[in-house]
């Protein structure tokens, strides 16, 4: 059932429930990492765009950071390359970096901007190379099997600094920044940065009220596959150690935890496969995922 199918009475109740949250978060910044099925399913894409526009219209400052894994994989396959991941990070040689920048900074970013604008928003597409607002350096991963050794994953970046000036100007003009996770090095080199990490760091720098990460799962799941609605750093460490959390969830969890520890008041990992998941998480009493607690 969609919102359009609800009875007038139920719709009124939903709006009444949302009012305190609209008052509470008016003028606040919410950073949204957009990825997963919500980016590939046409109906979910429309729901997401409408959610973003509505939240902006009622007075929230929305900043969107997006991924684009499936689209990158599709183009890599067309040029005869296969994606490789280590500890949730995409191994990025020079040719892969060209594909990543083409897909994220071109195709995906502009598609999202266009979709939001079609639904009445004023979205502006950016990469971290615009105004050099995301400065990065080469990331080397620790080899978990051989402590002390490092793994070279190519042109994968680690954030050095984020200049919020450009985003602040867009927010003040009621524009919605849509950011592709590409950074620039001190000598102009291009870096592919994990989108969850970029979203988390932007949330920290902007002193955002909330960071919301959309995923293809209900949230953080325990060993039995059951949803954990709230999780602490200690629990996260235990789940990483025993392998419950692994792969692509590692940078997501790490980013969420860092944001929670560095002043972002609400950090949520939610199910992007749910219609209007963003509205449900922000404007209702019961969210649709996992909240990361700072302690």
UniProtKB/Swiss-Prot annotation:
Ranges that cross the membrane: none
The family this protein is said to belong to: Belongs to the acetylglutamate kinase family. ArgB subfamily.
Single GO MF annotation: acetylglutamate kinase activity
Pathway: Amino-acid biosynthesis; L-arginine biosynthesis; N(2)-acetyl-L-ornithine from L-glutamate: step 2/4
Organism: Dechloromonas aromatica (strain RCB)
Annotated site (Transition state stabilizer): 33, 252
Pfam families: AA_kinase
Cytoplasm recorded as keyword: yes
Keyword list, A-Z: Amino-acid biosynthesis, Arginine biosynthesis, ATP-binding, Cytoplasm, Kinase, Nucleotide-binding, Transferase
Role summary: Catalyzes the ATP-dependent phosphorylation of N-acetyl-L-glutamate.
Gene Ontology process terms (BP): arginine biosynthetic process via ornithine; L-arginine biosynthetic process
EC number(s) on file: 2.7.2.8
Binding residue positions for substrate: 68-69, 90, 192
Predominant location category: cytoplasm
Protein name as catalogued: Acetylglutamate kinase
Gene name per UniProt: argB
Enzyme category, top tier: transferase
């Amino acid at each position: 059932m969609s919102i359009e199918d609800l009875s007038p009475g139920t719709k009124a109740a939903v709006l009444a429930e949302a009012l305190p949250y609209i008052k509470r978060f008016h003028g606040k910044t919410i950073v949204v990492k957009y990825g997963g099925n919500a980016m590939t399913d046409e109906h979910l894409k429309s729901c997401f765009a409408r959610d973003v526009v509505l939240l902006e219209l009622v007075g929230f400052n929305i900043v969107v950071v997006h991924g684009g894994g499936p689209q990158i994989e599709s183009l890599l396959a067309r040029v005869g390359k296969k994606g490789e991941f280590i500890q949730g990070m995409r191994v990025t040689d020079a040719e892969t970096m060209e594909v990543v920048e083409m897909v994220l900074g071109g195709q995906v970013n502009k598609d999202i901007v266009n979709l939001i604008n079609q639904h009445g928003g004023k979205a502006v597409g950016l990469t971290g190379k615009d105004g050099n607002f995301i400065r990065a350096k080469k990331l080397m991963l620790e080899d978990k099997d051989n402590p002390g050794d490092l793994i070279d994953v190519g042109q994968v970046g680690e954030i050095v600094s984020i200049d919020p000036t450009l985003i602040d100007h867009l927010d003040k003009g009621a524009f919605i920044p849509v950011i592709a996770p590409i950074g620039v090095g001190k000598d102009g080199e291009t870096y592919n940065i994990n989108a969850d990490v970029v979203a988390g760091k932007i949330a920290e720098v902007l002193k955002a009220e909330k960071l919301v990460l959309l995923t293809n799962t209900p949230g953080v799941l325990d060993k039995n596959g059951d949803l954990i609605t709230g999780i602490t750093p200690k629990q996260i460490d235990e789940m990483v150690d025993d392998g419950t959390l692994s792969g692509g969830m590692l940078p997501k969890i790490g980013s969420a935890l860092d944001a929670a520890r560095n002043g972002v008041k609400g950090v949520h990992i939610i199910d992007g496969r749910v219609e209007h998941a963003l509205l449900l998480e922000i404007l209702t009493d019961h969210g649709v995922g996992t909240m990361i607690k700072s302690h």
